[in-house]
Amino acid sequence: MNDFLPAIYLSFLVALLAGTAIFIVRQILRTRKTESRLSQLQNKLKKEKGTAQEYYELGTLYLDKKLYVQATKLFQKALSTKEEVEPENRALVYNALGFTHFAQQQYDLAVRQYKEALKLNPEYVKALNNLGHVYERKQLVAPALEAYEQSLQYEPNNATAKRRAEALRKRSVTSS
C-alpha cells in the first residue's frame, strides 16, 4: 500500500502539470493569433482607408484590451465610412460604441448609442440588455425593467434579462 502512494502522487502531479501546460499553450496560441490580427489591421489601416468591417474588427480587439478611447475612434470611423453597411451591422457598431462609453462611465452617451442600435434593429436583444444595464447604473429602475422586458419579448429564454428583470421587480416591491 505504501509503495503505491508515491506513484499515485507522481501520477497526479504529472497529470496536473500536463493539464496546466496544455492550458498555457492554448492561451499563448490564442494570444498570438489575436496579436497577429491586431498588427495586420493596424498596418493596413495606417497605409490605406479601411472598410467598416476592418475598423469594427480592430475596435473590437482594442475593446478586448480595454483601450476604450482608441476603440471609440475606430467605431466612429466604421460608422463614417462611405460604403453601404447593412442596418444590422451598423447596429453592432453602435452597440459596441455604447459599450465603450459604458465602460468609461459615460452613461448618457452609452444610452444614446444603444438607442441608435435599436433604431436600426429593434429586436437586438444584446443592445436591449445593455440599455437596461445602463439604466440600472443610473438608478432608473422603470426604464431598466422596460428594456429587460422588451428583451424577453424577443428572446423569452434570455438568462440575463430574466435575472435582471426579476431582481428589479424584487427591488421595486421591497422599496414600495
Model-inferred region functions:
Residues 1-49, 53, 60, 67:
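Long, contiguous interaction/recruitment modules in multidomain scaffold/adaptor proteins
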Residues 44, 78, 116-117, 150-151:
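Canonical positions in the second alpha-helix
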